């Protein structure tokens, strides 16, 4: 029984070791042309022409696939570059936001220190104002009494 080898949609019958080696090397290299040393058991010319047309079709499909693959690779490279640029912008923006946050935290610390100083001082001043008001009211009452007393005399 002769072994069958399939390359894409092409079936070939190989009955010699030399033919088998030719087919295997053709499959590896992508070269499906027949050499002069091919045995004399070639298929009829009509079958050979059909096989050559199929090989040509497979080669066209391979070229089309290569073009599509390259187009897809270029598209992916462009998308990657675009995404990389957007990522760089986002990182720069994040760095600016972090810097603003640090500055705001620093201002918050300063505000807290100022408030820590001012609140007790405000309390002291309120107490002092209260004492002064009380003193003023006491003097005002004393002056009012003295005026009434002098008018009564």
From Swiss-Prot:
Pfam families: DUF4715. Residues 46-109 form a coiled coil. It comes from the Eukaryota. Keywords: Coiled coil. Transmembrane segments: none annotated. One of its GO terms (biological process) is female gonad development. This is Coiled-coil domain-containing protein 182.
